[in-house]
Amino acid sequence: MLLFTPGPVAINEEMRTSFSQPMPHHRTKDFEKIFQSVRENLKKMTGLEEVLLLSSSGTGAMEASVISLCQKELLFVNAGKFGERFGKIAKAHSIKAHELVYEWDTPAQVDEILSVLKANPNIDAFCIQACESSGGLRHPVEKIAQAIKETNPNVFVIVDAITALGVEPLEITHVDALIGGSQKAFMLPPAMSLVALSQNAIERIEERNVGFYFNLKSELKNQRNNTTSYTAPILHTLGLQRYFELVQNLGGFEALYRETKKAALATQKAVLALGLKIFPKSPSLSMTTIVNEHAKELRNLLKEKYQVQFAGGQEPYKDALIRINHMGIIPVYKSAYALNALELALNDLDLREFDGVANATFLKQYYGI
């Protein structure tokens, strides 16, 4: 089965071998050296002053960021299930929250965000997804973060980059907390997340002492000494060590970002050549999302007959979307096969006659022929 879901993504053989080595104990000097190396690489990757690793899914890092940085009121963008989650986190902690709702295919607008901020001076934290993976939407987080800081530099900008980190370069100058997750571009199993922090965020965290398991003040103190407050994500840390080696072998992150972008744009072209519609108005490079009334039938046929698994949508688009992953290191031939299978499935359902245009378009675009 070829797994093309946007998380958990397929784990290649090189990454799987990182889990097969003998288990080290996390309170040893040997593991501390690996932990230190991984954190230093993550700092370089994100461009932020500190990076904390957490033994949790990405939702844990979202919660940790909100409770650590928001003292008064929160503003969040809801353009899908993951944006909505920021509001649920705020409610669980009795934090007053202001919600900006957008259609799942529509990116957030800078002027609307600034309008809410100006009307509510108690807002001291803002949350948004870089990529809202419910629909594969890319928000203009860089422009939004800059505009917020120019309007009120005291507002902390929290960006869920779980499906953007490791996919494309992110401008983080005006970002205070950047959140990542193991099961996306890092090609690891779920259950590890990270929070990269600006200097302003570090100072806020050191002033406060909130949470227990997700107490970032405690984690900051311990991880600066190459250990963790509680049990470390040991195998995930070893996996990250291997991930950085693989990226280096590719030529570094610039090379990885180029390959991911080429695959994403080539897939978009192939999808359009099939007469299909791309769902978001501003597509992310992490996935290609198709909206189609036959989405459920196509996904089922692809899985059963062609051994290709794409993801569907979430309510209310559960049976209307097909999401094709581009995160991680994916061989070109696998992407080409998956798109060819999609065209064959369209033919099988009498929706379009097969003529090989998907594969041809993808390869021409990818190789610049």
Swiss-Prot record:
Enzyme nomenclature, EC number: 2.6.1.-
Pfam families reported for this sequence: Aminotran_5
Cofactors (names): pyridoxal 5'-phosphate
UniProt modified residues of type N6-(pyridoxal phosphate)lysine: K184
SUPFAM superfamilies for the chain: PLP-dependent transferases
Record keywords, A-Z: Aminotransferase, Pyridoxal phosphate, Transferase
GO molecular function: transaminase activity
InterPro entries: Aminotrans_V_dom (IPR000192), PyrdxlP-dep_Trfase (IPR015424), PyrdxlP-dep_Trfase_major (IPR015421), PyrdxlP-dep_Trfase_small (IPR015422), SP_NH2Trfase/AEP_transaminase (IPR024169)
Similarity remark: Belongs to the class-V pyridoxal-phosphate-dependent aminotransferase family.
PANTHER family xref list: 2-AMINOETHYLPHOSPHONATE--PYRUVATE TRANSAMINASE
Descriptive protein name: Uncharacterized aminotransferase HP_0736
Organism whose genome encodes this protein: Helicobacter pylori (strain ATCC 700392 / 26695)
